[in-house]
């Protein structure tokens, strides 16, 4: 019986070993980037080949031919809400990201996601969602590994940067945040807003220069003057009152906030409120 059990175990080990696969590094490793831009969640999935002393644009990546914008499977990008890329509207969804290089430009093609692998021989025009272009910028250094990144991120958008070898292409993403935020704020303000709602609305109107009077109204509803205000509440009020031109009141808030930050031993609060206080003291 023991001999039989041993033979069964040995057989299982041999069978398992026969299906084992040797793992090795991928020449073009996959990269996945998740980025919040404004109110939009963006996910980018692509492979990253390296230069390895090869000529890239006009060589490995031929001019005027469809490129998968990376290696292996086509690059994919998804948006949780509609955006604009170089002023072309893109609906929420998941897309393939192809490109077509020339000597001086890189056209980016947002394409309906399909089961295609690798590059396409031609585009099906009915599947082209948008085609946008960027002039190549010559870089002073060589980028060894193909890189796509989101840069210059703000409340309202970012850039999509594509770099490889000594070339950079930049595309503007507009997250259309302002219209969405104003609509959201109006809806919230009509439905029993909380302290946090008033504070966020006030700071958004302040940061985006929409309506500083309304920002003051909301920040005062969020944080009524009292001895219980925290240093960051006073920082918000100082900034908003400063922009509104009410400098004496802004200075008062900055000074009080600075003292409370010291009491709380909050280094970041101390540093930021000291800067605001000194700036206001010099006006």
Question: Where in this protein do the model-derived segments appear?
Answer:
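Conserved positions within tetratricopeptide repeat
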Residues: 213-216, 248-251, 270-274, 278
């Amino acid at each position: 019986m023991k001999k039989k059990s041993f033979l069964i175990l040995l057989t299982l080990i041999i069978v398992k070993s026969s299906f084992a696969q040797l793992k090795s590094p991928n020449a073009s490793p996959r990269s996945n980037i998740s980025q919040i831009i404004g109110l939009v969640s963006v996910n980018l999935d692509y492979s990253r080949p390296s230069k390895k002393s090869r000529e890239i644009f006009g060589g490995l990546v031929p001019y005027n031919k469809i490129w998968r914008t990376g290696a292996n499977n086509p690059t994919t990008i998804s948006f949780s809400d509609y955006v604009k890329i170089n002023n072309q509207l893109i609906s929420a969804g998941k897309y393939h990201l192809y490109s077509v290089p020339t000597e001086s430009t890189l056209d980016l093609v947002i394409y309906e996601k399909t089961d295609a692998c690798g590059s396409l021989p031609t585009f099906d025009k009915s599947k082209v969602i948008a085609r946008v272009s960027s002039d190549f910028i010559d870089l002073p250094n060589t980028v060894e590994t193909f890189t796509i990144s989101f840069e210059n991120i703000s409340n309202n958008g970012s850039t999509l940067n594509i770099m490889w070898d000594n070339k950079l292409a930049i595309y503007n993403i507009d997250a259309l945040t302002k219209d969405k935020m104003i609509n959201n704020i109006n809806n919230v303000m009509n439905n029993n807003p909380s302290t946090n709602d008033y504070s966020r609305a006030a700071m958004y109107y302040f940061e985006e220069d929409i309506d500083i009077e309304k920002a003051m109204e909301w920040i005062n509803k969020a944080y009524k003057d009292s001895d219980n205000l925290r240093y960051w509440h006073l920082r918000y009020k100082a900034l908003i009152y400063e922009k509104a031109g009410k400098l004496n009141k802004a200075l008062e808030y900055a000074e009080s906030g600075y003292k409370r930050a010291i009491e709380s031993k909050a280094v970041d609060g101390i540093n930021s409120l000291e800067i605001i206080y000194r700036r206001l003291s010099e006006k």
